[in-house]
Amino acid sequence: MRRGVPMAGNFLQQENVVLTGACEAIVVDVQCIFPALGPLSKCFHTKFITTSPIAQMPDAEFIRFNAETAGENAKAIVKMAIDNFKNRKPELVHIPQLKQKATVGYSVEAIVKVLDGVTNSQVDETGTTKPLLECITSGVIRGAVAMVGCNNPKIRPDYAHIELMKKCIANDIVVIASGCSAQAAAKAGLMDKSAKDLCGAGLKRVCELADIPPVLHMGSCVDISRMMILAAELAKDAGLQINQLPVVGCAPEWMSEKAVSIGNYVVGTGIDTFLGVDPYVSGSSEMGELLTEGTRKWTGAAYTVETDIEKLVDLMIERIEEKRTASVSYTHLR
């Protein structure tokens, strides 16, 4: 995971970065690229650089990244940016002074290490998720939400992510976030350890004991596999199937094509997934039924779509509580 490199912002802020007049180079690969970046960069001194042969764009310089020479390719781009600094126009520079603290970098290994820090090494087994399971079993934490996905220019940016997270943590539901959703949380201060004061009594106590924020940053949106590995570890340590865990996924502002594959991965793994933007399947009632009900026969999970954020979070909490009491085989999670 990234080390020592602060986040500048998420998807819908990429043009704003250029507008500061302080961006020597903006580098993209193949995803979530605004088409206006090329002409916008020409209005400033910014170099717009693409790195993939399948995503070359007008008004861009192309530097192909190869696995064998990636380090040298990166150094060449950094040198271009350094050399371009002299072309910065002071009269066009405006750097906002808004900053927010965030604790990031919670891989599966990092989370297990945090959990080891609150175990009794003389009695308890280390290197497992059992301390977290004990919190869930006792009801101190009700469950977890994997919050993933984009900002969407069709709706108010970040609002859904932030409001959903606030209500979840207030109801003692820990949030694991990635990608643009995680950056929305960071900007709102939800990844600062002081955000524990927004939590319910149970989650607040856990945050204090483990010295963590209530919203954990787990990487980019395509790091969804980390979340699924964590879910698999929880299921293994609990002796349950993944679709029995009191865990849900959510992409309240999804926009990108990759969000479709990420969502299908989560549902296919057995975790109910909640969307705040309608998927483009309304032309087929059969497809709509398949996604919202049919997949449950195969994986034990399906999509729920609700564009009203207040109703969406209530449905998420309701599903988590249902999971806690759904089967006699795991009534210890009540």
List each language-model region with its residue ranges:
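Long insertion/accessory domains within large nucleic-acid-processing enzymes
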Residues: 220-228, 232
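Conserved small/polar residues in nucleotide/adenosyl-binding loops
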Residues: 331-334
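Redox cofactor-anchoring modules in respiratory/redox and cofactor-processing assemblies
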Residues: 226, 255, 260-264
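Conserved, well-structured core segments that form the ligand-binding/active-site neighborhood
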Residues: 1-138, 147-151, 156-187, 192-195, ...
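Active-site capping/gating regions of soluble enzymes
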Residues: 232-233, 266-268
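Catalytic core of carbohydrate-active enzymes
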Residues: 144
